[in-house]
């Protein structure tokens, strides 16, 4: 089956890796903190090489950057430039080490798939994603891991639509609300 590496990319990055059809991905968090942009990019490059050099997945999926107007007055140009640089580092390394498909997915589509809601307020959406992960038995430690697991689930569902049934209360009894 197809193996996916899903990445919620930022200076603190969440990742999830697994095959389509797996019960759960392997997931974690990595920090690329550094004294300057160059050190941040070097740490990201080293991490990605370790993730793909010996056994590259068939697909790497990265959460898309938001359009500049979405973050107007909420972030600095330096932060946006860093995120764009991280995207370049991850994409270049993945291609160099033989990953066949490198793609992006929008946060709205991922959240709609994983929680049923596309336009929740950011903090509520992150909490809903973590709650869904825990309901699935994926013991994520933070929202970075949760978002990466949601990206992995979304991507697996695009390859095999039956995978989408796992995150739907209609088809997964463990996710149903019982206290009405």
Residue ranges: model-predicted function:
Residues 1-180:
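Phosphate- and other anionic-substrate recognition elements at nucleic-acid/protein interfaces
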